[in-house]
Amino acid sequence: MKPDRRMGGWTDGCRGARLAAAALGCMFVLSVYPSSRLSAQLDRTKPPVLPPPPALKLPAVQTATLPGGLELAVVEMHKVPVVDIQIVLDAGAARDPADLPGLATFTATMLQQGAGRRGPLEIADEAAFLGAQLNTAASYDAATVSLHVPKRRLEPALDLLADVVLRPTFADSEVTRQRELRRAQIVQLADNPVAIAGIAFPAIVYGRSHPYGRPLNGTEASTASLRRDRVAEFYGAAYRPNAARILVTGDVTLAEARRLLTARFGGWERGAVAPLPEAAAPAPVARTVYLVDKPGAAQSVIRIGHVGVARATPDYFALQVLNTILGGAFTSRLNQNLRETHGYTYGAFSQFSAGRLAGPFVASASVVTAKTDSSLIEFLKELRRIRDEPVPDPELAKAKAYITLGLPADFETTGAAAARFRELLVYGLPLDYFAHYAERINAVTAADVQRVARQHIDPDHFDIVVVGDKSQIEAGIKALSEGPIVYRDLWGQEVK
């Protein structure tokens, strides 16, 4: 056989009559199977009936305890030779001092800016050389150091990970560089209405005395106060093995993971770690509209909500179904109303951000400026309707199918599975939690949805935050008479 470049493939030298005969043979074979019989059996007026999906089978979560009290969880997934490691620490922004918001996220950032004998460029270069992805971050509830690496590069990548977690240098020059970079990023937020709403809304809902009310990355003033000694102090107080858990997902066994991690983290020194701070949710106030003026804004950004629920709530599964119906999917009520029916927005959504403490419930959209008041009317209509009217059975079934049929995708890759299993470590959930997830979603009834809607969505106590051009939207909002209007700035502070 010789390559035929004109055909882009291989031929056997067939030409002329031989090629024609071959074609006739193909036609003859095809004609043996008439299609009319199959067509007669199909009723194309009805959609095909799908069989029930197979039960979701998840690998077991195996556990062990390393020297120093470090807890290890391993999820074996051997189809692809990659490994994901997540070190989860009780070092989130809930630990930020009241006078220094942003310290936890800044400390997490600094872990990659020099560790052991490596500077920031050497850390980045070595991760790239190993084909690894190394990330450090902090949320309100936890700090996470994560590593994704091919199995054959696991051991040298673990050496790099150990340096980053155990031996950060916090060089003054790098603290200064990262501090100035963050200050510039914060200044830029003032030009982004969506970012403004993301900062102002939790500050208004919770107030600055609650951990969830403080900006995750701090303010311009608090960032200017960041110094090496404060970063090192925070690290020393929170980055301890007795306040950490390691999750390993991928092509590795429990015995192998325990051996490799003990060799690198077995000497991690325990230390006294203060309990995670508790904070009561603020008392609800009567429905109020908070207007953040952004002159010349192309759209108005709307956030409507109040304090919601903690991750440990027994209503979690009913709330997942409720939110899918209300605003958790493209076909949900809010998006169908504000986008598809009225054309006020490209997308309207809702979410219960359940955390270690009671996180916020929020419904949100960026809307046409001239339709700000009309959008608020439709938002409030849908938020009241989900409480007042029972959910029809077809809508309930569709929401439950949306959740359960999408669940397998959360465990298809080691990275996706690691992200879901990480929830178990952050929130102290049972290790078999996801094995029963679909079952508990399917057990939710229409009565459950209405019950949790009435309990956890309270229109009389909504904080309605609107970021937009005051000169264009104020009159329309006032005419709605949905509550007093209070003027706030980027940080949620009152403007006199």
Where are these regions (language model features)?
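Histidine-acidic residue clusters that define the catalytic metal-binding segment
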Residues: 44-64, 185, 203-244, 276-281, ...
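An aromatic/glycine/proline-enriched structural segment found at the starts
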Residues: 42-49, 208, 212, 216, ...
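M16/insulysin-pitrilysin zinc metalloprotease superfamily fold
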Residues: 113-117, 148-179, 329, 349, ...
